[in-house]
């Protein structure tokens, strides 16, 4: 018997709700007789705003509470920013589908006084706000003259902190700014040769309980094949490196004919060591490409860099 009701678990931040409501609307359009409800909640990552993300511990910071709802039967699916979803999921849960990716790039948002500048021309000591070790490490590598300061809170809160003068600029995800209607705040889309984006950035991941064919039948309309191939390669790369959402691992994927080309990067926190390589293969076997690239980077010393980082940012007791 087909499902008549679908329950969605979501974070309650403004961006999360925009994303979840988009999923809800798309599913309602595809399944007119389906009743869809949303349960919004705060996650650990939403509640702890006075500690850097990497110091809290990065496994499921923005997902555990949503997953718990599914595991006890109170939700059928959870909507995540795919970049926040760990590569190893709790037993009984699975990544059901991946939506079409929006712009995965990192974006520079400047304070009004700096609108005539860009990353390369910001003066010595300019304060850059970011909560991402990946962005921090890559930008330190290219722009060692800049100062970097942690910034927490939702997108609107971060923009308010920038506008108040606490920072000279922020680095944020272009996709998130666009979804919230702040695309006009983007002053520079940061090219991949400066900052490779996070695994899964720009896409949504729909997580669900395993062995639920009725649920899979409902959500399959959201699956975007090319995005899924790209993100599965990226997630395999991250999983094999045993990295999480808060480590300096960056990626980029692109198609050339029937080939998928994955570029990956691991950097030290100070930006002085940066290993970057690429791998390619048939787009029909994306995970093998990710595994191959991870092995290449490990052979070049990525494992040692990551161990140093894990030791340096080990969560505080």
Curated annotation (Swiss-Prot):
Enzymatic reactions: 4 porphobilinogen + H2O = hydroxymethylbilane + 4 NH4(+)
Gene3D superfamilies: Periplasmic binding protein-like II, Porphobilinogen deaminase, C-terminal domain
SUPFAM superfamilies linked to this entry: Periplasmic binding protein-like II, Porphobilinogen deaminase (hydroxymethylbilane synthase), C-terminal domain
Pathway: Porphyrin-containing compound metabolism; protoporphyrin-IX biosynthesis; coproporphyrinogen-III from 5-aminolevulinate: step 2/4; Porphyrin-containing compound metabolism; chlorophyll biosynthesis
Pfam families named in the record: Porphobil_deam, Porphobil_deamC
Residues found modified as S-(dipyrrolylmethanemethyl)cysteine: 245
MF-aspect GO terms: hydroxymethylbilane synthase activity
Keyword Repressor: no
Keywords from the named record: Chlorophyll biosynthesis, Porphyrin biosynthesis, Transferase
Details of cofactor binding: Binds 1 dipyrromethane group covalently.
InterPro entries: HemC (IPR000860), Porphobilin_deaminase_cofac_BS (IPR022419), Porphobilin_deaminase_N (IPR022417), Porphobilinogen_deaminase_C (IPR022418), Porphobilinogen_deaminase_C_sf (IPR036803)
GO cellular component: a single term: cytoplasm
UniProt-listed Enzyme Commission number(s): 2.5.1.61
Cofactor(s) required, per the database record: dipyrromethane
Transferase in keyword set: yes
Example of a GO biological process term: protoporphyrinogen IX biosynthetic process
Annotated family: Belongs to the HMBS family.
Primary role: Tetrapolymerization of the monopyrrole PBG into the hydroxymethylbilane pre-uroporphyrinogen in several discrete steps.
Note: The porphobilinogen subunits are added to the dipyrromethane group.
Subunit structure: Monomer.
Protein name, as recorded: Porphobilinogen deaminase
